[in-house]
Amino acid sequence: MNRGLYGKLAVNNIKHNRQFYLPYLLTGMLTVAFFYTMLYLNHNPGLDELPFGAMDVELVLGLGAVIIGFFSVIFLFYTNSFIMKRRKKELGIYNILGMEKRHLAKVIFLETFFSAVGAIGGGLVAGIAFSKLMCMLLYAMIGYHAEIVFYVSESGVVSTILLFAGIFMLTFIYNLFQIQLAKPVELLHGSSQGEREPKTKKLMAIVGIVTLAAGYYMAITVDNPVTAVLLFFVAVILVIIGTYFIFMAGSIAVLKFLRKRKSYYYKKKHFVAVSGLIYRMKQNAAGLASICILSTMVLVVISSTVSMYAGLDDELAARYQGDIGVSITSENPITEGDALRELVNRTIQQENRSIKDEQGMMTLTFSCISEDGNLVIRKHDDEGSYSSDIIMLRMITREDYEEAYNVTVPELSDHEVVLTTSDDYEKDTITVGDYTYPILQKQHFSSENGHWMDNQVYYMVVNSVEDMAPLYEAQKEIYGKNASSYYYSLYIDIDGNREEKIACGNAVSAAIGASGMEEGHDGKYYIMIENRAENEDSFRQMYGGFLFLGIFLGILFLMITVLIIFYKQISEGYEDKERFAIMEKVGMSNEEVKKTISAQIRMVFLLPIVTAALHVLAAFPMIRMILAVMNLNNGRLFAYCLLGTITVFTVIYLLVYKMTSRTYYRIVGRQIG
């Protein structure tokens, strides 16, 4: 066969199937452009000049490149499999007319090659052309001001070509197996396979319900941030499995139940819609579940990153309680704490800064094992101790507690304490080791007051530092070199602009270093110094990077969702065309056909977005606690961001549904619109 004929056939096939190939190539270009942009930004030399947070931003961008690369594989394989299914009849005709499968393989190879060149080449051109604009957006989000020099990332270009060339090669191998293993008759009927009525898979439906319920239960009942972080991915996997199983098995069971209801089923619009969905539900369900999962990812990623960025000031206020923070771990807290305070105050005065607010706090924190309501001081590796039984006991003086948390604590007599927990402590006394303390008052620690607390931490308020001494000695005797020391924290707000506050903080750090106090880190004491104004840039850059990545990934997931919806509408249209033509021949009018179509596509395409919204609402408590680990305790802000994201995404989803429905109508009937 003339070698030039293969190329002509490949080009003509792409042109003939442009309705399928154009969206495929366009989204392929965008995916390539996204991937290159992430690599370009990650290797941008300008980021190396960031005064703070360069590693954080580069880590976020590197993570984004990995995520985009991973989903590119899934996305391109999905769209390729759809196109191949629609084209099996065409390839079967070629086979019957005399083309051998090796000839078909050459044509498919050239089609894949041309598609790869178009997608990779077009994507790289777009990525390079808009790279400077993307860099400007990133710099704006992280609050970085620097000159942006246009350049092409050679390593980014090479990595992009290698990845996507590999993906397209894998799709070619997949297509080759599809052709080689199929008989000519199977190719002719390949695009209409899957019409057998699926069986009701009760076990799959039950497993789906159980896994989804388990995922929801974890998300809703999680009671502390640490557990939320540990169980998040477990809950996600359970929800994904449950979603797919319920869509694939539960939906069929529901449709068959509706078919048994004669009063519902034997109506024109219900009869056609329900019977049509039953015969193709296995195929539909996988696509609809994918749309649901992708929609959920869009909602979670965008709402979380937007709320993190919008709540940056709250997060900084929770993380840094003063412009300058100095803490010391010591065995002699009063003497060394007073010396540290005096040195810091003197240095601030030397820098000509005024102290606006000053707060000092002394605490002693050590771990215990909860046994029958008592706290036992014992090493955790002893037999019988479990992580769920570990309680972190934090002792604090009454005066410091009132000042730090803006609460009122009643006067305490000898050995009396106030116990603050986030769970229900029922006893009127608390026993720690060999010491029992009467509880004058119990308080609940609420997350709504701007501070989040793990329910495995107890705050025990005492009169003075001297009241901490017995338990300090007790835990020191048990834990030895691993025992806790007193922890003195000093937070000071000063006047001045950002640069003056940074300079003052650096002066405090230098003064402490020159005093020789830091040399006590051999176990006697250890000093840590924090400068809020200086660290604010690092946080802003990291969270700005997360926001940029969230928007980028949100657009990518949305694009994949739109393409799946588009291909599904086309697939549904071609599969329904003959069926509705038969209905028209037996007496159904165009108007009745249109109503039937509307009922079917509404049922099919509104289900994923409704389910996605339910997933996100169920995940709200868990995501909120995970954000609390990052000091975002403003639940109302996250709720507003989540509701806003759901609203905007729903509008976009409905617009896409409306536009793709027109394509469906045009395929099914010329007069339906």
Model-derived regions, located:
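Hydrophobic alpha-helical segments
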Residues: 114-258
